[in-house]
Amino acid sequence: MEALLSSTTLQLKPLHPPSSFSSLHSPFSSISVLRVKGSKKAETFIQRSNFSTVLPLRVSASSQAAAAETSTSISIPSEMKAWSYTDYGSVDVLKLESNVAVPDIKEDQVLIKIVAAALNPVDFKRRLGKFKATDSPLPTVPGYDVAGVVVKVGSQVKGLKEGDEVYGDIHEKALDGPKQFGSLAEYTAVEEKLVALKPKNLSFAEAAALPLAIETAYEGLEKAGFSSGKSILVLGGAGGVGSLVIQLAKHVFGASKVAATSSTGKLELLKSLGADLAIDYTKENFEDLPDKFDVVYDSVGQGEKAVKVVKEGGSVVVLTGAVTPPGFRFVVTSNGEMLKKLNPYLESGKVKPVIDPKGPFSFDKVVDAFSYLETGRATGKVVIHPIP
């Protein structure tokens, strides 16, 4: 940490999040919370490590819970098409399989016929084997974000029925044993509590672009203590998370001022999302701005610079970066209740998904979609649609 703020002697103490944070957890990664104390100021750092199903191609009986006793009026095949990998590695390990077993559901789950999915950095980092220690066994069908139609419900499911159009992040814990069955398939099984009814005004492709990114954006703002009347600087405002941070800060939390950075060609997008100040990082250094901000939300990994523009006592949310002891780590979780909470803002159009103009990518172009995502140049989300 001395390298991060070389002019300041730092003392780190772990923060214990208030109980009010427990209800709306982000599935994006684990979060570490550090309080940094200097001689003149204190900032709070929330650092995230970006981290991403059965192929029973076959899963042993011990690895799957007994299927729920359910019935369905919808015809469901025994096998499906799905993208999978049996070894960790580059995009070359991804294979499109046509005889993957459709997953069974547990009593608290629904089976979703997937219409659209979206990719996140966690997906390719998981594929690269960054999280082997806590990953589910190979083979893996990747994918977190999903939008589709419920075709079967478990015996304990109360709030959803066959035919409901839903969306969500299917992995309750992003890093701790995520499912083998992800969303890059024709079907997936997911707990009822992790999904919500799709906003009526959104297409399946638009809905699939939201879950992981909007939960990450909302969670970061909440944990940073952001509230009405505060100012925020968003680094990487045109990305999947950054584009939603701008909108949530402005239209949900009531920010007094929203500034954001992007390349030259994306400045108008920032303004359309609600940014009061759009900064071209190819021509300007945001750390030279005359004003400081209550919160800096760093989605691109510029923590050293971010701390230079935060107010005394302000907060910095960082989506990339190592945890420095004695900071502690805890795993955040997906929660459909948060999606329900944001539904009015989505259906009113105050908060909108941003889909990269190169997409949506068709289901047979998943390798191209991964390759594009890994360039780091995507605007908004990389979406896969339709999924046959």
Curated annotation (Swiss-Prot):
Please list the residues that make up the transit peptide in this record.
1-60
Q: Where in the cell is it found?
A: Plastid, Chloroplast
Q: What Pfam families would the database entry show?
A: ADH_N, ADH_zinc_N_2
Cited Gene3D superfamilies: Medium-chain alcohol dehydrogenases, catalytic domain, NAD(P)-binding Rossmann-like Domain
One Gene Ontology MF term: zinc ion binding
GO-annotated cellular components: chloroplast
Q: Mention one GO biological process in which this protein takes part, according to its record.
A: alkaloid metabolic process
Q: What EC number(s) does this enzyme carry? A: 1.3.1.105
InterPro entries in UniProt:
ADH-like_N, AOR-like, GroES-like_sf, NAD(P)-bd_dom_sf, PKS_ER, Quin_OxRdtase/zeta-crystal_CS
Q: List the disulfide bonds.
A: none
* UniProt binding sites for substrate: K125
User: Which reaction is catalysed here?
Assistant: 4-hydroxy-2,5-dimethyl-furan-3(2H)-one + NADP(+) = 4-hydroxy-5-methyl-2-methylenefuran-3(2H)-one + NADPH + H(+)
UniProt KW keywords: Chloroplast, NAD, NADP, Oxidoreductase, Plastid, Transit peptide
Residues annotated as binding NADP(+) are: K125, G240, V241, S263, T264, G265, K266, Y281, F330, V331, V332, R377, A378
Kind of enzyme, top EC level?
Answer: oxidoreductase
Task: Using the UniProt record, give the first listed, main subcellular location.
Answer: plastid
Q: Which family does it belong to?
A: Belongs to the zinc-containing alcohol dehydrogenase family. Quinone oxidoreductase subfamily.
This protein's assembly is summarised as: Monomer.
Protein task: Enone oxidoreductase involved in the biosynthesis of 4-hydroxy-2,5-dimethyl-3(2H)-furanone (HDMF or furaneol). Can use both NADH and NADPH as the electron donor.
Name it. Answer: 2-methylene-furan-3-one reductase
Q: Which organism is it from?
A: Solanum lycopersicum
